[in-house]
Curated annotation (Swiss-Prot):
Belongs to the bacterial ribosomal protein bL36 family. InterPro entries: Ribosomal_bL36, Ribosomal_bL36_sp. Keywords: Ribonucleoprotein, Ribosomal protein. SUPFAM superfamilies: Ribosomal protein L36 (SSF57840). GO terms for biological process: translation. Signal peptide: none annotated. This is Large ribosomal subunit protein bL36. GO terms for molecular function: structural constituent of ribosome. Pfam families: Ribosomal_L36 (PF00444). GO terms for cellular component: cytoplasm; ribonucleoprotein complex; ribosome.
Amino acid sequence: MKVRSGVKKICKKCTIIKRKGVNRVICEIPKHKQRQG
């Protein structure tokens, strides 16, 4: 899980989801997981 000020998709399988007011990137590749904060 990477914590970043801005999140963006790394590959085609990445999806951006807003959960409890926090933007997150969910992907099959664990390395691509991100959250904004």
